[in-house]
Amino acid sequence: GLGGAVIVRLAVYLKGKDAKKYRKNVEYGSARWGSKTDIAPFMDPKPENNIILTQSEGLMMSGRPKNPANARNKNVLVVGGSGSGKTRFFIKPNLMQMHSSYVVTDPKGTVLIEVGKLLSRGTPKLDKDGKPVRGKNGKIVYEPYKIKVFNTINFSKSMHYNPFAYIHNEKDILKLVTVLIANTKGEGKSGDDFWVKAETLLYTALIGYIYYEAPSNEQNFSTLVEMINAMEVREDDETFKNAVDLLFDALEQKDPDHFALRQYKKYKLAAGKTAKSILISCGARLAPFDIKEVREITMYDELELDLVGDRKTALFFIISDTDATFNFLVSMAYTQLFNLLCERADDKFGGRLPVHVRCLIDEAANIGQIPNLEKLMATIRSREISACLVLQAQSQLKALYKDNMDTIIGNCDSSLFLGGKEETTLKSWNSLLGKETIDMYNTSVTKGTQESHGQNFQKLGKDLMSVDELAVMDGGKCLLQIRGVRPFLSRKYDITKHPNYKYLSDFDEKNAFDIEKYLSTRLPVRPGELYPNYEITPEELAAQTTA
């Protein structure tokens, strides 16, 4: 009895004292590929309600799943070298889902041509019970997307975009100046931000004057350029006043505390020679607006950026993949878009837009820098906005956003690698995938007077995919990593299997979207333009009917 209890107690003590922590079969790493079970909680049973990522994996559009632990933001980082299929395997499949509004960067303008007809057909109109509405003929009624296009390759095939149309207060003026400075080049001395600060003062003053004092049809970049051109400076005569000086003198008489006047007075502290240098830098920065086509395309606005989240809209930014001259206009539009949608969500819709807005930013490194993108990526999620950054290599993001690159990538809950050989990208994915534990079996033979044989079993760690394996990955395969989920090695999405594929021009050339024809059917109303009104009496109408 007692002796047995002592022995048992002693055995337990000795075992505990000599206890070791074992992790069987994961000694060198627990990495493994994801399975259907891993992705199931993150996908909607209805395929049309998902973001398409691979042939077998997706992400539910609902931001509030039944289990809050399964909530993920919809920001996606897509990396793939040239020819890896970023458009075919990611952008077009997601446009075919048609569950959101879309803002698409479209290099060369081919995506709009290929999917435009599908979007103009739209989605079935639903009643309050979520069932399709049918017309008198029994056919389902469809609601077409509102298609907008801003074309920096051919301005004659573009709608108008006027950044001034979205200025509503002094804060908006400062935002516009910030994005203008960030995406255009002046002629200041390298490494000295004095010139940038001086230009900022002048732009803020002039744009403030235009917004508060000019008629609506003159609130555009054309007026800004004319004001810069009218600002003659005489180095030998500090008392000389140019036409713009006289405008601000008159403004001071009317409102001594005017926002624009306060900024202009700060600019005027510069001496004649310095002021002249500032104007030269401003002239260089605004040089694109001296081009007649650019001045005309920014004369008034048709894009309605603030309404993209109110109704299903598809906005296409067509950019050149070889010439970045006018890409700053697209960056400016993206910056205004994010700010406008966030403000509209907060001010009008209680924090969430009625229609989710997905920004599919192809060639994200080529449109220029979007100021504060690292902060926007973290805050847009709650407003029903998401951004998909599509790049050829991660190093492109580093070159554009410097130390903020990691923050931007960290705010993308999903990362998709379609293939490539850029070293930074390969090393990043190699590290992300981790190591697995494998079994190694060695045999040995020792020959001599007596031959002996040996066997050795041991475990070691191996990269789930090494750098060289990543570089030669099958062109039909891709890698997907979703936050908190095992990585997936899957097939790229087969676009021909999508139920809406038959409406693309890929399926039938007759489905090609005619941009010129679409734009010609619109009758744009320009600010300040007068239109004649005609009245027809009932007698005249009756006479016309019987004639």
What kind of region is each of these model predictions?
Residues 1-51, 170-180, 227-230, 451-482:
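Short alpha-helical interface patches
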Residues 1-84, 88-91, 125-136, 446, ...:
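Basic- and hydrophobic-enriched, low-structure N-terminal and domain-boundary segments
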Residues 35-42, 55-68, 274-280, 319-321, ...:
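A broad, low-specificity signal for short, low-complexity segments enriched in glycine/proline
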Residues 37-40, 328, 364, 420:
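A short glycine-/small-residue-rich loop at the edge of a beta-strand within enzyme catalytic domains
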Residues 47, 53, 328-335, 429:
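Conserved long hydrophobic alpha-helices within structured protein cores
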Residues 67-385, 400, 405, 468-489, ...:
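P-loop NTPase motor domains
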Residues 319, 323, 363, 391, ...:
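Short loop or secondary-structure boundary microenvironments that flank
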Residues 377-479:
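Conserved ATP-driven motor cores of ASCE-family P-loop NTPases powering translocation/secretion/packaging/pilus
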